[in-house]
Amino acid sequence: MSLAEDWIDPNSSEDSDIQEDAELEYTADNPEKEQRGVFSLEKVQLQFPVSIRCLAVENNILVMALTSDKLMIVDLERPEDIIDIELPKKVLALGLTYKIFLDPSGHYIFVTTTAGDNCLFTPSHQGRVLTKLKGHTVEAVQWNLNGGNILELLIASKSGVLLELVLTLDSANLKRIEKSINTLYSFPFMESPMGILKNIQDDSMTIVTNKRILRFEPKTSRGKDQLYFSPAFQGSMKEILSFSEEETAQCFSYSPFPKNLAEPYTLALKTSKRIIYLDIMNPVNPDIQDYEFNESPKLSVPTVEMNMILTSFHLAFLDLDTLYIVNRVNGKESYQQRVNLSPHEEILGLCCDHEKNTYWLYTTDSLHELVVNNETREASLVFLEKGDFEKALECANTAKVRNTVLVGYAEFLMEHEEYERAATLYAETLKSVEEVALKFIELNQKDVLRLYLWKKLRSYKSTMKIQKSLLVNWLLELMLAKLNSLDEKERLELFPENVMQQRQQVQREFSTLLNQYKDEINREAAYNLANNYGKEEQLLQIATVMKDQSYIMHYWVQRENYEKALETLNEGVSQETLIQHATALLTHRPNETVSIWERQTDLDVHALIPSLLSYNQRSHVPVEENAAIRYLRYVTGVLGCVDPSIHNTLFCIYACHSSSNESYLMNYIEQQGNHPLYDMDLGIRLCLQFNCRRSAVKILVLMKLYSQGVELALEADDCELAATIANIPEEDVVLKKTLWQTIAKYMFSKKSGIKETLRFLENSEVLQLPELIRLLPEDIKLDDLSDNVCDELDHCMKRIEQLDFEIGQASEVAHEIQTNAENMRNRYIVLEPNESCWHCNQPLFSEPFVLFPCQHAFHRSCMLEKTYKLASEKNILKECQLCGPSYAVRLINEPFSTDF
């Protein structure tokens, strides 16, 4: 597949069509190029009951005057609806229909006769005879409907005068519509007007007569209440052209109003000797072109009165029964067609619809339409052949023709070494990019090539991804090469000011290309180009536009520019990139790196563990300055991370630094509490590995491995710590005793300070001297224990004496209780029969009562009631009535329940 094939998007049908069209290029060797189908004469399928006398058409409204004194009105948009109108008898009393005129909308119809009678038909097809125009056979009419009920007509009379007729179009009084008539201009004897042309730009009037062409221009702008046509004739008159006495005008026509700058706005006048073209758009210095008869002898035969019309670029005329069309641009014949006539049929003339740009040929018995198919297409190729490229482009209304014109124009500019303009035009064509680029490369026009590729790139559609990508990378290479070339010039001090301006221009182009076409950039190819050309600034610019922070960071780390790398990290990079360069950044910029990490709360901390451990191994800083510890403390403390691997890592780093100071690890273990997040088995191994025995003991205690903890503490010769551990299991006396025995054995095995050892072991509260003596080594003399034994015996004696005293006190209390009980059995009180209750004064024996030693007696119910009244709810609710102290005391003398 060639490079040229890459420029056409196979998925774009539009581009394919343009490419196929572009294959047909204009060449002078092919005279039939683009001519086929431009003009065709087609007969209209209309049946006429009688012959046609004259015809007019405007705005697709076609009106024919028939020999039957009727008007046939055909709306070409609805040709099936034909309207017949009878002409007023007054109009045709003395003459025949001479001409028909239509206003630009086609709604008003003006009919004039050979006898000078005239009538006007309104949109409702009501005819009114214009009596004020009696005797004037009209040659031309200009219309002005001011939007109200006033219709102004500028009339050219065959009698040699210009008239302004004002009509009132009041539907209530259509019988009297003529308001006023004024004579604006009178022509000399033997001079009669043939046509009127209104210039819409300056309200001037161009009048064509049989002797000359005049232009009437108003001096001032028209007043609010002033008539429309009068000001032009009150101003200046300029004679544009006059004919000799031997030459008279026969007919005239003007072209449609131009749609573009290439179309001429032309008035054509046929005389007895020649055809004259007049440029209407330039009234001051008109461009008058003569078309001599010797170019086409056929024109010398005037068969009908109106045998000539103008299209946008062509002249159509009749010669006997043949229609000829000549291109006005190059004067060559473009079309001819013989009109088939019946034995008694005659051609009457040609007619033009200036509103819809349609053209008609009519005979006595038939109507033909001159169909114009894309006339500007042929005109464009003719302008191209003449080298008038600007007009050719104006007229190029198809992709095929425009491509042909652009290619021709560009090749012309290449021949004249106007390379930049040629590049701009080439970019608009479908010519292969490879072919055009080779032309500029062969001419060593690299700047022009860059311009061409720029223009071409901007012309591509969004769907042409591959082509755009190729051009973007090509442009990148050209710009990088240009920058290197400018650097070399600057190094040699050649034109420094010019070099600076060029560099700024290329840099602007480079930035624009990256910003506008970043989606089409091949990232790897662009990086390779920038690296190959050694353009660091542009390389980073590409990566920045592509938002490839990973590449930028990799670039700076490779070059050990850690400040720039940190700036990139702060702007945000992918997790993968951050992890990839974490070790390097931690090693060289630890605190700054951790500060940035702390602002990125969504990091995969687990993936950073290798970098943190590597940094910890390489760095030789105290715990307070260790960035790994700082970050892990932030993650576990602030972010609340509970991942065991993170806590294990922090534990490991603490352990590494605990050989000199174990307090940080101890604090961490204490902070973790009884349910730590680190692995305690791993923690013990790490503590043993780094000789952190106190920390290991703490972990063993947390695991309730008291025996191992005591043994480890004793291995560290820390009896105080071992004693602390032994006192922890308060409820398990057996275990506690075993632990203390282990401590005792260890301390006795050291054979130093037996007295101090025994004094220390006495604090255990679980080991007695006899037990300690059994634990003593055999080689220890009892003399060393005499003081301790004596102290122990004294302690036992004091204890025995204390127990004897307590027993004596208990015996005395028991004897006293027994004596009181015996006395209570022999005690009684005598009650009289009339004894009453001390509360209610009722007889005491009437119901159950209570008698107290003080000889007061109460009914049981009265006593309870009195108690309820005196006791508060708070006192009643103070204790349980079954097990409260007061109740329990009362139950001392009660027998045991049989239900128990």
Curated annotation (Swiss-Prot):
Superkingdom in the source lineage: Eukaryota
GO biological process, one term: Golgi to endosome transport
Bilayer topology: Peripheral membrane protein
Keywords, in A-Z order: Membrane, Metal-binding, Repeat, TPR repeat, Vacuole, Zinc, Zinc-finger
Main location as per UniProt: membrane
Localization (cell): Vacuole membrane
TM region(s), chain numbering: none
Gene Ontology terms, MF aspect: protein-macromolecule adaptor activity; ubiquitin protein ligase activity; zinc ion binding
Keyword presence, Flavoprotein: no
CHCR repeats: 602-756
Residues in RING-type zinc fingers: 837-884
Protein name: Vacuolar membrane protein pep3
Protein species of origin: Schizosaccharomyces pombe (strain 972 / ATCC 24843) (Fission yeast)
The gene coding this protein: pep3
